[in-house]
């Protein structure tokens, strides 16, 4: 049985309900990565809704736990997006994207990592986007 992911529309409310009442405490919380992922996905959805663009998004998880956080379809392929809260790019950030690309090469269109750092860049195989630049991408 497949289980859906649930997202809070208001990440600030989610943090408050988790007992995180001061902004400086958020990055030390064990759920920071999940809240960062939630924020990025919900902001992408809001942006698309506001521009009257079709909103379709999924995630991928295989039976061994490998996953890609966000899959945005385009025709018969998908943009695979991994979301990481860390401010420094690590090799492990690309693991889920690589596994998906190798398992489904005909479906894979491109791969992007959105991370908590400040510098966007293009690498040979992947696009790396700072969370600060993601909104510009949606315009």
Regions found by a protein language model. Give the residues of each.
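Switch/connector loops and helix/strand junctions flanking conserved nucleotide-binding motifs
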Residues: 16, 90-91, 120-124
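Domain-level recognition of nuclease-like catalytic cores that cleave nucleotide substrates
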Residues: 116-139
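Terminal-proximal interaction/regulatory segments of ATP-powered molecular machines
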Residues: 79, 83-86, 98
């Amino acid at each position: 049985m497949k289980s859906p992911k649930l997202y809070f529309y208001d990440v600030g409310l989610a943090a408050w309900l988790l007992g995180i009442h001061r902004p400086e405490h958020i990055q030390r919380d064990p759920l920071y990565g999940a809240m960062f992922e939630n924020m990025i996905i919900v902001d992408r959805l809001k942006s698309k809704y506001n521009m009257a663009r079709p909103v379709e998004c999924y995630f991928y998880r295989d039976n061994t736990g490998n996953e890609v956080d966000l899959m945005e379809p385009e025709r018969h392929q998908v943009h695979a997006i991994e979301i990481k809260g860390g401010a420094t790019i690590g090799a492990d950030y690309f693991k889920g994207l690589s596994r998906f690309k190798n398992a489904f090469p005909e479906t894979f269109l491109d791969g992007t990592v959105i991370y908590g750092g400040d510098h966007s860049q293009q690498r040979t195989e992947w696009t790396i986007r700072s969370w600060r630049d993601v909104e510009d991408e949606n315009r």
